[in-house]
From Swiss-Prot:
It comes from Saccharomyces cerevisiae (strain ATCC 204508 / S288c). GO terms for cellular component: COPI vesicle coat; endoplasmic reticulum; endoplasmic reticulum-Golgi intermediate compartment; endosome; Golgi membrane. Residues 630-656 are annotated as: Disordered. This is Coatomer subunit gamma. The modification Phosphothreonine is found at T638. InterPro entries: ARM-like, ARM-type_fold, Clathrin/coatomer_adapt-like_N, Clathrin_app_Ig-like_sf, Coatomer/calthrin_app_sub_C, Coatomer_g_Cpla, Coatomer_gsu, Coatomer_gsu_app_Ig-like_dom. The lineage of its organism: Eukaryota, Fungi, Dikarya, Ascomycota, Saccharomycotina. GO terms for molecular function: structural molecule activity. Belongs to the COPG family. The keyword Transmembrane does not apply. Keywords: Cytoplasm, Cytoplasmic vesicle, Endosome, ER-Golgi transport, Golgi apparatus, Isopeptide bond, Membrane, Phosphoprotein, Protein transport, Repeat, Transport, Ubl conjugation. Gene3D superfamilies: Coatomer, gamma subunit, appendage domain, Leucine-rich Repeat Variant, TATA-Binding Protein. There is a cross-link at K647 (Glycyl lysine isopeptide (Lys-Gly) (interchain with G-Cter in ubiquitin)).
Length: 935
């Protein structure tokens, strides 16, 4: 039937849906006619299915009436019509009542129907059977599973798979038949007679049978092992999807028990050379993802073979295979870029691939494999390419280059020249240009030696920039960084041009930027010029511009002639407020208004950061984004990836909580607010530092406890967050007894303990133990016991029974350690080597770690213990090297004194040797941090 004839009741060029009520009435009338017009019925069913496919639905009573009318068409022996009927039954069964009435008609077709409609009838059983009626189809399904016809067998296996959650007992009765179907090479009738009506068999029933068999045996590890051994022998699998499923079963097994990997090594090696590209891809994906989590169990030869297989797939004609191989290599490049350097020639050839998804993936993968030796050549390779792609792909490439600039700050010149070239010479929209400017801002912030060149080029760019938002950002950057540059007068001319030539939004931003140059110490002669310009601008016709110029003049006069510190800070800000904390405090201030705002908002209660601290926070967040990307590459390939639980806000990990930055900052503010609201702790003064929360019990324990260390100038407060997971027990008088490990030489004096009066089931509360420090820096370990009185809960009142005195008990929890890292905050330095050489105090220590830890695991532990900021991207240890140097920088949370660590690591058969070289302004902090680094 031609498409024109089939669609004669619709406008073939229109996307409009047919009227729902018209279709309903036509169906009800036509399906009940006698004799049945099969051609007309098929047409109406197709129009009905189109409605349902587009999201239209019918009320339950109308859907049920349609279902009954359609079920009458079972009496017609036209096979094409019956096929359409089964499609309609499938769609209507979810919104109709009493669908079981069609079961007998479907059963007849399953038993006596032709080979054409029998598979459709079997598939529709899924939608009409329930737990009470599924057993009636057992015999029919069992015989269909072992049918010699591939379509019938596949339909029965798929139906059984979908009935498994409904009636598992019934489906388990034909496990043996399912296992036979895996090895049975089913073929269509007359396949060898070259009949035009039957295609060659793809043996898809093997895949369906194996999928069902896995679901039946997935809880039995030994059964799965036997299944893999049995089906991997003698090349019995002919269908490539079945072979891919077998690889996934192996992946599931080694995910549960990594020690099984050695048993499958020969099999995996054989699969890497399989004739099917999909099998090679799935096997390479399995090996590389497993190696990310268990590198010691994967032989270098096998890993190299997996990379070689992916490398060969980069040159195959099939686009999907090239893309899949490239995607796996891209994931590897996030974790171990050095291992795919051998693929660079193939990756470079894909840069000009006609498929832009492939070409973009190729270039971003190449950039991730960059080292200090080949960055220049990579940048030159993509310079011409980037001008020929769309903005979306350009942004992806710029983001990759931005990451490269953070990983290799010493190569800033070639990266900066590339970004400037693209910014000036490439056409693109706002998002593209903004991504380049963000990358340049990162380079200026985190690579100080690049500042002068970057700012000069940005000055040239704003002369022709068409985007207001980007102009405002660049003007803000010039106002922030320009006054401290060697030649600040260079930027004043460009900024003033914007005041003269642009609209009010740009001119307002330019006035603010211009005012910041008045107090620059690098060129005091600028003062008179800036004052003259601002006085001229103060007569501007636009009030936004005029007001800013007027207030800037007032601030400058107060700061220069009256030594007004507040005015000077407003012009040259030395501190940055914690924005999430400020937002939270303002929201609380507005919502708790009791005196019509007679009491002014106290900005001193908001956390402030110095410029170095702010840069350290921003750099650490960017590093954690890269770290999280690497973690995702391992999660994406595990069988349980979708069920990985979300981390708590106070989870303990180097990479930080699995939250956005806003929530993470609010957590620190929450701690400070809770402590300052406690009367006994208020006299301690301002909170200096808080640690990350540390798990002190197992997550599945009866009482889940997490500890947080809070540091004040002369005091230490230990906070214990306790969760009662028992459902019928309440805890009274809950407290933690903290005993210093070295009690006879304790440098802490316990002041008080704040207990929790009552902790009901599923509730969480905090108890506190406060100490007075006898020295400025105290390092101590605490043995902890949770003490409480248990009382049984009355389920009617959800309170303990009256008169129940309870039972006193205690619960030992893990120790908590106060170390030197708790006295340190992350801080940023643009030139680590120069800063390290300038610091006066020095301390050296050597450690020999006997535990079987990788260099990366030790790096993570050191960063967590020291609380310092890793610089020059040394937080990522190369996986193919036995040595690494970690560089850390921080400041004392108490005094602000600088401390820097340079840690050299060498791994050998005897263990891991560490040489820690620390330098700082405070000899005591430097010594304690170096010597207590591995505690």
């Amino acid at each position: 039937m031609s498409a024109h004839t089939y669609k004669k009741f619709e406008n073939s060029t229109s996307g409009d849906l047919p009227d729902k009520m018209t279709i309903y009435q036509d169906c009800m009338n036509t399906f009940n006619e006698s004799p049945v017009n099969s051609k007309r019925c098929r047409l109406l069913i197709s129009r009905l299915l189109r409605l349902l496919a587009q999201g239209e639905t019918f009320p339950q009573n109308e859907a049920t009436a349609l279902f009954f009318s359609i079920s009458k068409l079972f009496q017609h022996q036209n096979d094409p019509l019956r096929q359409a009927v089964y499609l309609a039954i499938k769609e209507l069964s979810g919104i109709s009542e009493d669908v079981l009435m069609a079961t007998s008609s479907i059963m007849k077709d399953v038993q006596n129907g032709s080979d054409l409609i029998k598979p459709d009838a079997i598939r529709s059983l899924t939608y009409v059977l329930d737990e009470s009626t599924a057993f009636s189809a057992e015999r029919l399904l069992k015989s269909a599973v072992v049918s010699r016809h591939p379509s019938i067998s596949s339909a029965a296996l798929c139906t059984s798979y979908h009935l498994l959650p409904i009636s598992e007992v019934t489906i388990r009765r034909f496990t043996n038949e399912t296992q036979e179907a895996v090895l049975d090479l089913k073929q269509f009738p007359n396949q060898h007679g070259n009949s035009e009506y039957y295609p060659n068999s793809t043996y898809i029933s093997q895949y369906h049978a194996l999928g069902l068999l896995y679901q039946l045996k997935k809880t039995d590890k030994m059964a799965l092992l036997k299944l893999v051994r049995h089906f991997s022998e003698n090349n019995s699998m002919k269908n490539q999807l079945a072979k891919v499923e077998l690889v996934k079963i192996v992946n599931d097994l080694i995910y549960r028990d990594p020690q099984l990997f050695s048993q499958f090594r020969p099999l995996l090696s054989d699969w890497l050379s399989n004739k099917f590209e999909s099998v090679q891809l799935e096997t390479a994906k399995l090996i590389t993802s497993f190696a990310t989590r268990n590198s010691r169990l994967v032989a270098p030869e096998l890993y190299a073979a997996a990379i070689s297989a992916l490398q060969s797939l980069l040159t195959v004609p099939r686009v999907s295979s090239r893309f899949a191989a490239l995607r796996i290599l891209n994931r590897i490049s996030m974790v171990s870029p050095e291992k795919i350097v051998v693929c660079n020639p193939e990756l470079e050839s894909l840069i000009n691939d006609s498929n832009r998804n492939i070409s973009t993936y190729a270039i971003t993968t190449l950039l991730k494999t960059g080292t200090s030796k080949n960055i220049s050549s990579l940048i030159s390779t993509i310079t011409n390419f980037i001008h020929d792609v769309s903005d979306d792909f350009k942004i992806i490439i710029i983001d990759a280059v931005r990451t490269l600039s953070l990983n290799f700050p010493q190569e800033w010149k070639s990266i900066l020249n590339f970004l400037i070239d693209v910014l000036k010479n490439s056409e693109g929209g706002f998002k593209f240009k903004n991504s380049i400017v963000e990358a340049l801002i990162d380079i200026v912030s985190f690579v100080p030696q690049s500042k002068e060149l970057a700012l000069e080029n940005l000055c040239d760019f704003i002369e022709d920039c068409e985007f207001n938002e980007i102009l405002v950002r660049i003007l803000h950057l010039l106002g922030k960084e320009g006054p401290s540059a060697p030649n600040p007068s260079l930027y004043v001319r460009h900024i003033y041009n914007r005041v003269v030539l642009e609209n009010s939004i740009i001119r307002s931003a330019a006035v603010v930027a211009l005012s910041k140059f008045a107090l620059t110490k690098n060129d005091p002669t600028l003062y008179e010029s800036i004052i003259s310009l601002l006085k001229r601008i103060a007569n501007d016709k636009d009030d936004e511009v005029r007001d800013r110029a007027t207030i800037a003049l007032e601030f400058i006069d107060s700061a220069r002639n009256k030594d007004d510190v507040i005015a000077q800070n407003l012009i040259e800000s030395k501190y940055f407020y914690d924005i999430p904390s400020l937002e939270s405090k303002l929201s609380s201030y507005i919502s708790s208004n009791t005196d019509s705002f007679a009491t002014a908002f106290d900005v001193n209660q908001v956390r402030k950061f110095t410029e170095d601290e702010m840069k350290a926070i921003n750099l650490k967040r960017k590093q954690e984004q890269i770290f999280n990307q690497k973690s995702e590459t391992t999660l994406d390939t595990t069988p349980e990836a979708e069920s990985v639980p979300e981390k708590r806000a106070d989870a303990n990990s180097f990479a930080g909580p699995n939250l956005d930055d806003h929530q993470e900052d609010l957590l620190a503010t929450k701690y400070a607010d809770e402590l300052l609201s406690i009367e006994q702790i208020k006299p301690f003064g301002q909170l200096v530092n808080s640690s990350r929360a540390i798990s002190l019990t197992e997550p599945e324990a009866e009482f889940v406890v997490r500890g947080v260390k809070h540091l004040f100038k002369d005091n230490v407060v230990l906070q214990f967050n306790i969760t009662n997971t028992l459902t019928d027990i309440a805890l009274d008088n809950v407290s933690v007894v903290c005993t210093p490990e070295i009690s006879d030489e304790a440098e802490l004096e316990e002041l008080f303990t704040l207990q929790v009066d009552r902790l009901l089931p599923s509730e969480e509360a905090a108890c506190y133990v406060a100490f007075k420090k006898l020295d400025e820096i105290v390092m101590e370990g605490f043995l902890n016991n949770l003490t409480f009185t248990t009382k049984e809960i009355n389920p009617d009142t959800n309170e303990p029974f009256d008169g129940d005195e309870g039972f006193q008990d205690e619960y030992e929890i893990d120790s908590i350690f106060l170390n030197a890292g708790d006295y340190v905050k992350s801080s940023f330095t643009g030139n680590f080597s120069a800063t390290f050489d300038e610091l006066p105090c020095e301390e050296v220590a050597v450690f020999n770690i006997q535990e079987d830890l990788s260099i990366q695991e030790v790096v993570d532990k050191i960063i967590l213990n020291s609380s310092c900021l890793p610089v020059e991207s040394t937080q990522f240890a190369p996986s193919d090297s036995n040595s690494h140097t970690l560089k850390l920088f921080g400041k004392s949370a108490l005094t602000g004194s600088k401390v820097a660590l340079q840690i050299k690591m060498i791994k050998s058969s005897k263990g891991l040797a560490l040489k820690v070289h620390g330098k700082g302004e405070d000899s005591l902090l430097c010594s304690d941090l170096v010597n207590g680094l591995m505690q």
